[in-house]
Each structure stands twice: as structure tokens, then as C-alpha cells.
């Protein structure tokens, strides 16, 4: 003899009648198949799945249905088309709740193998935090891709102050001399060229782009390379001395305030995406606080200040 298991969400009405904008689950651990992921093609992700609950008298949604749909769909390689199918399946599974909207979020790190700046055949792994958000409402799907890119930033003002100190030191040590041999100047610079080091630091750019309808893939690597090319000083993995020297040269040739970094990214993104947002943060080596800048394509007048996360 089998007894029917109780389902309170179905059999008992809500004591307080009110529609709910979103109901679901977050921080679901799940593997994601990603063609761009190296070396295995699978990444460990954290997922959020939610639907709306417009019927005010219903006590709750069917959480297990959402979990099973997420699990089943993510057996396929991740793509915009697959996420669109998942969103529609989530809505269809809650027809008895009157649901008309669904949203999914996936957060993970993708590992990309990047070559050294100069050393032939040398490469190393770099991890890039990624977030993908997808939402469907009234038959219309929207998708957004977000990545974090680490880079080095060197303060233009600090570099100018350093050059001034070097110039003064050279003038003081060679006062009264009317002619200097090139090799003597070169030797002096070799000994004293780092009289003062401008303050530089690791920095992060968080870039978010809205994807156009019917896009075939997320193409995470392409967005990473676009951002790193715009900034010109991405952090490195495997390096030898020749690569470290090349990195120093790049930093010296690309001095930038936080404003410069944001504008560089804006210029490149505006040529390829109709809708995007950029938030850059420099973990200042001189100060006990960070420098930040934001830009984007949207026309919103008011934005909440982003929550700070220590690095």
C-alpha cells in the first residue's frame, strides 16, 4: 500500500495573496560543457534559475522542476540557443503557476592558455571569471556576457615625477660638463636609470556586453582578446627575463589613469557592441584606497555604486 506524498505548495493556498516577481534557486553547483574551456571542455559553475509567480493565491513554485530542467539542458554544450530553450522550458513547466518569465545566471572561470610576450614556445594558463545572464519575458530572450580581465596600470603622474628626479640627478652629477660621450651616458643610465620607480599596480576591468539575437556562440576568448588588446598590459602567466623586460616596456608605453583604461575599453567595445558596460578598478600601490571608473552605452541617469570586493 502506497501513500501519496504531500505537496504543500500545491494543496495549500498562500495566506498572503501577492504576486512575486522572481522565485527560484541560486548557488547551484553544476558542470557546464564549454567548447572554449581548456583543457577538458568542462567547467565548474554556479547557477541561478528563477521564474515569476503571477498567481497571488499560489503558495509556491515547483523548485525540483527547475533543477531537473537545468541539469538536463546543461548536458549539452553551452550556447545561446541552448539557454533560450532552457528558458522556454522553465516557463512551460510552470504554466500552472501562470509564469510568463524566466531567468538563468551561470558563473564560472574559464581557463585560457596564453603565449608569453617574447619567449618562443612558452605559454601559461590564465583564469578569467565569467558570468552569463539570460532572461525571457513575453517571448523575447535577452543575453548578457560578463568577463573580468586583469592588467597592470602605471600612473602617468608618478612616471613624470620619476623622470623629473632622474633628470635632476643627471644634471647635478654632470654640472659644468659641456660634452659627454654616448657610452658614458649609457653607463650612467644603467646605474641610475631606476632612480625612482613610478607606482604601478594590478588592476581589473569588468566588461559586460549584451548579445544580439540569434548569435551562435558566446565567443568568450574573442572578448578577452579584444579587452586585453585595448588595455595593452594584461597580466602574464609564464615569463622569462626577456618577457618581463617586454612587459616593462609595454607598461612604460601605456601609462594610464583609471580614466584612460575605461576610455580605451569604451572605444573598442563601441565599435562592436550596441550595448555594453565597463567598470575598471586600480588597486593603488601608493594609496590605501582604490581608483575606479565606469562607462557604457546605456543612457541611464542614475546608477547605484557597485559593491566593493576586496582583492
From Swiss-Prot:
Its EC number is 3.5.4.16. It catalyses: GTP + H2O = 7,8-dihydroneopterin 3'-triphosphate + formate + H(+). The record marks 155 as: May be catalytically important. GO terms for biological process: tetrahydrofolate biosynthetic process. Keywords: Hydrolase. GO terms for molecular function: GTP cyclohydrolase I activity. Pathway: Cofactor biosynthesis; 7,8-dihydroneopterin triphosphate biosynthesis; 7,8-dihydroneopterin triphosphate from GTP: step 1/1. It comes from the Bacteria. Belongs to the GTP cyclohydrolase IV family. Converts GTP to 7,8-dihydroneopterin triphosphate. This is GTP cyclohydrolase FolE2. It comes from Xanthomonas campestris pv. campestris (strain B100).
